[in-house]
Amino acid sequence: MTSSNISICATEDQMVLQTSLLLRVNVILMTTVAIFTFVLTYRALFILKQRPIFHKSTKILLYTSLIFVNIHEIIFMVIQCVAFIRSFTLSDKPCEIMRTTLECRFKNHVLIFGIAGMNFNQFGLTVDRLLATVIPQTYSHLGSFPGILISILVIGCSIAAPLIIAIGDPYDDIVPNCFFFPQHSAPRANVFLIILSALVIASIFLNLIIIFANKKLEKGTRYYVSQRYQKREALISTRIIVYIAASQFLGMVLYSTIVLTLRLHKSMIPVSMYHNIVWWAYTVPFAAVALPALLIHRINLVGSNRKRVINRITAKVETQEEHMKSLKELWG
């Protein structure tokens, strides 16, 4: 089938969807989430620079994660805002309101690049934490090298993801929005969604093992200050990564599970209902905003705990001094 003999006009159901209040509310909500992501990212970058909680390698990977998050939010906001404008300006033009997958190709590729990068880099953070646990001495001397190498691999895999999904796709069908996968790429898109879910689940599982291992190792190095500091740093970093992985898990598993289920039963679902559910099931922006938000929260929490410990020690010293002063006065 070629693009010349395919109808580009929207059906009655598709027109209802494209001009519905639900779509417009969804766009406003997701755009608000994107703006929050940008603001929180700025704050997270500032805190990452100021607070020396993470190893250089981990910090580079966190910077990479924030870049992917914002690439995704920028392209998704552009896609959504275009859909919002078209829902008003083309509300009476059914043969113009739909998008061809060919004209959506670049935006769709960038969107998949962002989604893949967010998830692949999350797994990269887990590998980084694994290295810090298994070979702590070597890892500490490698500096930023592991983070740079993993980031390069993540970027390469993320570039490859949309290209592999689109292999052989003629781009001859129409979609209501550029974040929908082309029809001919659907089987590979389904595999992609399954891989993302599997990676997130693996990340959480491995991070929990790493936390347990670091707790055990920390007890075993109680009297070795340098080694205990390394284990404590690894434990704190890994806990933060687990919280981030959990947010990614909720966002990606919800999205991939719902969308995969819809794809497998697409023939049984009315068109307008199918696309409405897909729009609202796209929970990736919430996973995106959770990254800088959780980074800020967890780093501030670590800082507050440290201050509390220091204040407790200081208070204890002052109490001892007052006690000695009292004894001197008593015996003086």
Curated annotation (Swiss-Prot):
GO terms for cellular component: membrane. It comes from the Eukaryota. The keyword Iron-sulfur does not apply. Its main location: membrane. GO terms for biological process: detection of chemical stimulus involved in sensory perception. Disulfide bonds: none annotated. It is a multi-pass membrane protein. Residues 1-26, 86-109, 168-191, 261-276 are extracellular. One of its GO terms (molecular function) is olfactory receptor activity. This is Serpentine receptor class alpha-10.
